[in-house]
Amino acid sequence: MAYRGQGQKVQKVMVQPINLIFRYLQNRSRISVWLYEQVNMRIEGCIIGFDEYMNLVLDDAEEVHMKTKNRKPLGRIMLKGDNITLLQSVSN
């Protein structure tokens, strides 16, 4: 526990992964998904649904090739949670 002057306690709150995903969904944030064992490609899109297995439904999804920066539109897709290594918010 951290302390802030004059005996005030500051408690750090742990953020559950499901809450962060839900925040991305609520804010319609555009996210970048790093893929498992595919370091040269990422998927970008807006989360419109997910489940307890971290399967994601992405809207306006694009396949992004990291070396060439080429983008391939995919539309609305369902990405299995097994393929996800990292989720990151990206600015448009």
From Swiss-Prot:
UniProt-listed InterPro entries: LSM_dom_sf, Sm, Sm_dom_euk/arc, snRNP-E
Keyword Nucleus annotated: yes
Coiled-coil ranges per UniProt: none
Keyword Phosphoprotein in record: no
Subcellular location: Cytoplasm, Cytosol; Nucleus
GO terms classed as biological process: mRNA splicing, via spliceosome; spliceosomal snRNP assembly
GO cellular component labels: cytosol; methylosome; nucleus; pICln-Sm protein complex; precatalytic spliceosome; SMN-Sm protein complex; U1 snRNP; U2 snRNP
Family that this chain belongs to: Belongs to the snRNP Sm proteins family.
Subunit-structure text: Core component of the spliceosomal U1, U2, U4 and U5 small nuclear ribonucleoproteins (snRNPs), the building blocks of the spliceosome. Most spliceosomal snRNPs contain a common set of Sm proteins, snrpb, snrpd1, snrpd2, snrpd3, snrpe, snrpf and snrpg that assemble in a heptameric protein ring on the Sm site of the small nuclear RNA to form the core snRNP. Component of the U1 snRNP. The U1 snRNP is composed of the U1 snRNA and the 7 core Sm proteins snrpb, snrpd1, snrpd2, snrpd3, snrpe, snrpf and snrpg, and at least three U1 snRNP-specific proteins snrnp70/u1-70k, snrpa/u1-a and snrpc/u1-c.
PANTHER family linked to this entry: SMALL NUCLEAR RIBONUCLEOPROTEIN E
Name of the protein in its database record: Small nuclear ribonucleoprotein E
Gene from which this protein is expressed: snrpe
